[in-house]
Amino acid sequence: MMPRILLAEDDTSMREYLQRALQRVGYEVDAVACGTEALPFLEPDRYQLLLTDIVMPEMDGIELAQKASEIDPEIKVMFITGFAAVALQSGRTAPEAKMLSKPFHLKDLVMEVDRIFEDAKTEAQFRP
C-alpha cells in the first residue's frame, strides 16, 4: 500500500501542481487550501506525511503540524516555504520536520518525500 499524504498549500496552482506530481509517482494525496481545512482530515494512521506550506491564512503550517502530531504521533511532517529562515527563527517549536524551500524542483520534492518514507521503513524495522 502506498503511503498517503495530506497536502496543505494556500496557493491553488502550487497545490494542484504538487498534488499531480506526487500522484504521478504513485502517492495517494489529499490536498487542502489551509490548516483549518486540513484538521477534519487528520485521524490516527490515516496519513503517513503532512506536507504543508508554513505561511497560510487562518492557521499556519507550524500550528497545523503541532495539531497533526497530537492527533497522530507517527505522522511525518515536511514544510514547504519561501520563508525557511524566518520560520526556523520564529522561536516556536515545530515537530521534528524536514524543510524544503521554494523555489524547488519537483524531483527534489519527490526525492525528499521518498527519503522520508525510506527512513520511516528503516525505523519501523528497528522498533522492538
Question: Where does each model-flagged region fall?
Answer:
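C-terminal output helix
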Residues: 104-115, 121
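Two-component/phosphorelay signaling modules centered on CheY-like receiver
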Residues: 11-30, 97
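Short amphipathic alpha-helix used as the core "switch/output" element in two-component signaling
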Residues: 40, 62-74
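Active-site residues of response regulator receiver
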Residues: 53
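Receiver (REC) domain active-site loop signature in two-component systems and cognate sites
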Residues: 56
